[in-house]
Amino acid sequence: MNIKDAKNEIIHTLAAYLKKDGNGVYTYPLVRQRPILLIGPPGIGKTAVMEQVAAECKVGLVAYTITHHTRQSAVGLPKIVTRNYGGTETDITEYTMSEIIASVYEYMEQTGKKEGILFIDEINCVSETLAPAMLQFLQNKTFGTHKVPQGWIIVAAGNPPAYNKSVREFDIVTLDRVRKISIQADTDVWLEYAGEKGIHGAILSYLSLKKENFYMVENTVDGKFFVTARGWEDLSEILKSYEELQVEIGEELIGEFLQKEEIARDFAGYYRLYEKYKSDYQIQEILDGNVISGQLKTCCDMGKKASFEERFTVTEMLLEAVTERISVFQKTDEKIEKLYENLKLLKIFLQEKNSVEAMEQFVASRRKALDAKICSELLTAEEAAREEEQIRILEEYFFQLKELHISDVAEGIEQIGERFGNVCRLRNEKLEETKKMLEQAFSFLEECFGEGQELLLFETGLTGDDRCSIFISQYGCPSYFKHCELLLYSKKENELRKECRDLLEE
């Protein structure tokens, strides 16, 4: 199973385990709620998936790497208590609450979330003294004598023995009480995720060409060599940061993230070509429509003579640039929509007041609500940043009214309306620029490569990207719909070829 399917399986499990009847009672029998055990190679995204599931399902997440714990912190500390048995007082040993179980209750107190996921990573790499406690945890959902709170499901993760010498195999008794999901690296699934996350375009196009270099782990007499999904994602961040700082990027830097010399060297060479093609083909200038006809002809002539890899890379660069600009416009659009909703609430609030000075109370209440949401972990970092931006815009509007010495509510609302109108006009200009940019991309591909596989690749990329497909469905793109027939024809042609091959094999 790939990591995307595993994520969906966890989401479905949450829905099943946390289903309630009309009286608010959980319907799934607690004794049948098997913990999920994810077994897969390191760096494939198991921990990241848990964060995504918790955010999408709006439940809590408490994550622990069990190898960082001793038996005392996991099970609890022993304490002597006195009990009366048959009229005789006896000292016995009990245990304090496990640090892990206590952290779940602490999380519930702080956030108000009563349901969630307890995620235990590297569960099959525990020390010998902690191994029995882990088996008890998976079998009975308890640490020591304390149970995992109701409404919390258990997900554990570990690596196969081939990747870690510290791995302890679970016995059949334990495996018969969990839902074991084996996860494999899948380049296509990761590329889909990477496109949404804005991974560097050079990495996306390189792995589209050389999928076999996406993931590998070798343990030889010469040492350990590996390339993981985590490595590619971290490399993307450093590439973007160094490019902004105009710091030179060399093979040594890339080798720090891709710890397989041949792959690091190969990607370093591809990255240099990627940057050169971006400059030679003047991608940004073409999309902006700022290339004079002579330069455009030079770029097209260069593309017509190019190798398959170069043509593929140029197409991927165009797709990356288009996707990035559409994404920027959509974020702006979402910001304006949110601002419109806030201004409607502000207008209702001010109509009941005598002066626009009351706007300060409105802004203060919004900030207080935001602080409460952040404290309760009800917002992701990105959502919190968007809310903070909205509050700052409202504060700026308030300061502008004070600078103009406006205190009348009606006049203040009118001034804010004018400023919002200017924002909307700028948004419409950006929309037209984005639509024009999309048409420019199609025009260049047609002139440079004709209606060949490059155009098909570009069209397929736009269709497969949610941001691009939503933008095109909302605002249109004549060139896209014109070439949709090419995409459909190609799909039908491939289906016919497959049918022919099947018939010949029979």
Model-predicted segments: where are they?
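AAA+ P-loop NTPase catalytic core and its hallmark functional loops
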Residues: 1-212
